[in-house]
Amino acid sequence: MERLKAALQDCDVVVIGAGAGLSTAAGFVYTGERFENYFSDFAKKYGIKDMYSGGFYPFATPEEHWAYWSRYIYINRYMDAPKPVYDDLLKLVNGKDYFVITTNVDHCFQKAGFDKKRLFYTQGDYGLFQCSEPCCQETFDNEAVIREMVKWQENMKVPTELLPTCPHCGKPLTMNLRSDNKFVEDKGWHRAAERYENFLRTREGQKILFLELGVGYNTPVIIKYPFWQMTAKNPNAIYACINQGQAVCPQEIQQRSICMNADVGYIVSLAV
């Protein structure tokens, strides 16, 4: 803990890499009581066991599909995080030169007040639709229609007139989430990717803390492996990994690494 505090104090730059474990620590849990509270009807009718697997359920109609998804998006994107982990994290980097790269799609960084120009969320956003085709590299804000779907759904179906369609080609809209090669990387996505690359390039060789939070091995090529490589390349860099159950680093950077097998929220609250 002391080493982490010292690293935060001494560094000129903080690059945060955030995975699903960070949002879990903030209370966005997809199982158990939270699932029961919001999806007991779906669990009963369809045998769905948790929110995540429900997202893959082959519903017979689009009205049922969107009844499930609108509720899912509403509670995981438009409701506030149950615990203040993201707020604590913002306090931690306040006044620092920082950038955030995240595979999370729940918008928690923006909601906590992180600078949007210092954020790159690589895998999409629960708050955006895209064309299912896709006929265009464009995304569409979904808040208004999601709130309507949640409000007007009955018997686990949304009214047909609320089904979202592409304004350009009329095909159904779908979530802007990376699951296959149809994922739309819109102008905003490319601008964020460019800002992240620029940030790293212009801070090469500086005292950088690569702070990895709640990142597992689902997509290690996005955050984990690059953080290891950049730490190995820069003798002034420190790699810190906080993750329940999986906090490791390669031997080459062991001397300049802080690996904490612990609850991310707890450690962040201690570090503030």
Residue ranges of model-derived segments:
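Conserved catalytic alpha/beta core of Sir2/sirtuin-type deacylases, generalized to analogous enzyme cores
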Residues: 1-272
